[in-house]
Curated annotation (Swiss-Prot):
Localization of this protein: Cytoplasm
Record lineage: Bacteria, Pseudomonadati, Pseudomonadota, Gammaproteobacteria, Pseudomonadales
Annotated positions binding ATP: 30-33, 51, 87-91, 415, 479-481, 495
Transmembrane spans: none
Cross-referenced HAMAP family: CH60 (MF_00600)
GO biological process, one term: protein refolding
Gene3D superfamilies in alphabetical order: GroEL, GroEL-like equatorial domain, TCP-1-like chaperonin intermediate domain
Molecular function in Gene Ontology: ATP binding; ATP-dependent protein folding chaperone; isomerase activity; unfolded protein binding
Name of the protein described by the UniProt record: Chaperonin GroEL
Function: Together with its co-chaperonin GroES, plays an essential role in assisting protein folding. The GroEL-GroES system forms a nano-cage that allows encapsulation of the non-native substrate proteins and provides a physical environment optimized to promote and accelerate protein folding.
Origin species: Pseudomonas aeruginosa (strain ATCC 15692 / DSM 22644 / CIP 104116 / JCM 14847 / LMG 12228 / 1C / PRS 101 / PAO1)
InterPro entries: Chaperonin_Cpn60_CS, Cpn60/GroEL, Cpn60/GroEL/TCP-1, GroEL-like_apical_dom_sf, GROEL-like_equatorial_sf, TCP-1-like_intermed_sf
């Protein structure tokens, strides 16, 4: 085991503070509408240019182990805020820096760190409660666009496209962000339920120009097993042929003789048919088949519930207005399911989302929910260069998280104003002793730091602006983009309450831990001596004796 170096008390905290300040100073340059860019070096290719706080934080690693610990702890603040609300990373970093700097001054003056932390925690709880009261619901498209614009560093086109996507797919819909191929941002919306399975044979294609199979007003046969024997399917195929409607088969797999027979029947025009594999695997496949059944008003043919393929009738089949199948995807449009059943299924999935602890499961459940309740929108980010594309995509993702958070918990006035207004919650707040009161006062000062930083980045005088904002009330604040004072909500400067709350909670949590640090342990880095050169191989022997 390598030898360790241990630092105690003040010398440990000083080292940690250096790391905190290095990381926070780099990150806070990006805050606000006039935030600056940070250039990140890459081991290969062009450097990345970003105004995204968490991207900057992730890149920073310091040489000194003790300073690096401080930097990594602040990085954790940014990550926690990002995990909770998907945005607010820079705000969280600025708050954490202010709490740690103020807190360590108090500790150096001889205060009890544990009581300081208790004071900070008390004040945080009160401010969070006040933020929830200040929040107003974010319902209309205009407010959603404004939130997206602010989060995307004042890029209106991004705010607009996100609001449009949310309007089209609803609050439950899935919105994904991809790299586009043009210069402009594009939005494409998939109506109905789409899953990532294409046709099992290209012979099912009936639209050669688009290489797609389109079925109008089809019946859907949903089977939870492999189909390899055509005899099992004959009764249901005959019934479908008599009904004169196309058929889509969704099964675990269709292979061999069964697939060949379907292809031949389709090509001869005896029965218009297409087959695809069921989406997902294992239990998730069963659940998704059930989703399709509920959406189309059909029944999954499964031996688990005592249904066999031989006994399937037209009553077991689902109905849809149209189905489009290409090489990669199948889209079911306007399923004929009963609305009450669909709503019950949506409620059931929502309950599962609340109960699951796995992020992966939550994401998959969210997708299933969107396919049943809303739709799927894809935002394709356009840019002139690869570097700009990456930077823009990160901002679009941030803005998307921010708008979701706004819909969830409402909005508060932006530009650091909400935190200043929430200070009234701790005006009369008293701790159990004087040191807790110092902790409360410390947070009171720290909470102003985001507003100060936004103003400083815009090139104005922070103290003057903070004083003027404090004299106002309600939504009154400072628009750093234009240098005008006024109603922040009317000027369209909004922050999601969840983002502001998560940023403060993450900063107070880790800031409190740093203040109460008494010792730090790190591995001693030994300078390895340079390797010597290769030994001389000596001259080659003479070649005497040759004529």
């Amino acid at each position: 085991m390598a030898a360790k170096e241990v630092k105690f008390g003040d010398s440990a905290r000083k080292k940690m503070l250096v790391g905190v300040n290095v990381l926070a100073d780099a990150v806070k340059a990006t805050l606000g509408p006039k935030g600056r860019n940070v250039v990140l070096d890459k081991s290969f290719g062009a450097p990345t240019i970003t105004k995204d706080g968490v991207s900057v934080a992730k890149e920073i690693e310091l040489k000194d182990k003790f300073e690096n610990m401080g930097a990594q702890l602040v990085k954790d603040v940014a990550s926690k805020a990002n995990d909770a609300a998907g945005d607010g990373t820079t705000t969280a970093t600025v708050l954490a820096q202010a709490i740690v700097n103020e807190g360590l001054k108090a500790v150096a003056a001889g205060m009890n760190p544990m009581d300081l932390k208790r004071g900070i925690d008390k004040a945080t709880v009160a401010i969070v409660a006040q933020l929830k009261e200040l929040a107003k619901p974010c319902a209309d498209t205009k407010a959603i666009a404004q939130v997206g614009t602010i989060s995307a560093n004042s890029d209106e086109s991004i705010g607009q496209i996100i609001a449009e996507a949310m309007e089209k797919v609803g609050k439950e819909g899935v919105i994904t962000v991809e790299e586009g191929s043009g210069l402009e941002n594009e939005l494409s919306v998939v109506e109905g339920m789409q899953f990532d399975r294409g046709y099992l044979s290209p012979y099912f294609v009936n639209k050669p120009d688009t290489m797609a199979a389109e079925l109008d007003s089809p019946l859907l046969l949903l089977v939870d097993k492999k189909i390899s024997n055509i005899r099992e399917m004959l009764p249901v195929l005959e019934a479908v042929a008599k009904a004169g409607r196309p058929l889509l088969i969704v099964a675990e797999d269709v292979e061999g003789e069964a697939l060949a027979t379907l292809v031949v029947n389709n090509m001869r025009g005896i029965v218009k048919v297409a087959a695809v594999k069921a989406p997902g695997f294992g239990d998730r496949r069963k659940a998704m088949l059930q989703d399709i059944a509920i959406l189309t008003g059909g029944t999954v043919i499964s031996e688990e519930v005592g249904l066999s393929l031989e006994g399937a009738t037209l009553e077991h089949l689902g109905n849809a207005k149209r189905v489009v199948i290409n090489k990669e995807n199948t889209t079911i449009i306007d399923g004929a399911g009963v609305q009450a059943d669909i709503e019950a299924r949506v409620l059931q999935i929502r309950k599962q989302i609340e109960e699951t602890t796995s992020d992966y499961d939550r994401e998959k459940l969210q997708e299933r929910l969107a396919k049943l309740a809303g739709g799927v929108a894809v935002i394709k980010v356009g840019a002139a260069t690869e570097v700009e594309m990456k930077e823009k995509k990160a901002r679009v993702e941030d803005a998307l998280h921010a708008t979701r958070a706004a819909v969830e918990e409402g909005v508060v006035p932006g530009g650091g104003v909400a935190l200043v207004r929430a200070l009234q919650a701790i005006e009369g707040l008293k701790g159990d002793n004087e040191e807790q009161n110092v902790g409360i006062a410390l947070l009171r000062r720290a909470v102003e730091s985001p507003l100060r930083q936004i103003v400083a980045n815009a090139g104005d005088e922070p103290s003057v602006v903070v004083d003027k904002v404090k004299q106002g009330s309600g939504n009154y604040g400072f628009n750093a983009a234009t240098g005008v004072y006024g109603d922040m909500i009317e000027m369209g400067i909004l922050d999601p309450a969840k983002v502001t709350r998560s940023a403060l909670q993450a900063a107070a949590s880790i800031g409190g831990l740093m203040i109460t640090t008494e010792a730090m342990v790190a591995e001693i880095v030994e300078d390895k001596p340079a390797m010597g050169g290769m030994p001389d191989m000596g001259g080659m022997g003479g070649m005497g004796g040759m004529m």
